[in-house]
Amino acid sequence: RDTDRSRGLGDVYKRQKRQLMERGVQIGADVPYCIMRGTALAEGIGEALSPLPPMVKCPVLIAKPSISVSTKFVYQNLKLDDTTIHPDIDRLIDDIKAKNLHDIAAHMGNVLETVTIPNYPVIDEIKKHMLSNGAVGAMMSGSGPTVFGLFDDEDTAKKAYKAMRSSHLARQVYLTSVYNNRK
């Protein structure tokens, strides 16, 4: 009986979570991801999510410059036919499964950078600053302007955090780590 109840509660939880995700997309494309948690492949406008194995644990430096970027502007000006940056998603998924941080960093990419960076060069400056301070990879998140850098050790990440704060390239700077918790 207890097992049946537990299974029943688990089914209710999964159904409620799915409903929350469906409703959440009406608020914003990122909401379903926040509800789902963990590593996922996002498709469409970010609302179609497929769970992936957990990302390798690593320090992450996040930097947001003192600018705002219109997501609408970025998508209106995105010309996929003219874009040479096309991340190999299948290879990146294999890198995530293999938990190879350096390969993940080498194969990650964001086509939206082709629109955002020419209009807001500080984003590229932040990426270069992270890389020159030890990040194994740095990329703009979504349509921007926030940039994240992946590090393979805590000490390097802490030094990069201090360097980013003193550079004044970003108004908000955070040092965190990959969080893998999916229930």
List where the protein language model places each region:
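Single conserved hydrophobic/aromatic residue that forms the stacking wall/gate
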Residues: 2-13
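ATP-dependent small-molecule kinase catalytic core of the GHMP/sugar-kinase superfamily
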Residues: 14-137, 150-183
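Catalytic nucleophile-His microenvironment captured as a short glycine-rich beta-strand/loop
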Residues: 147
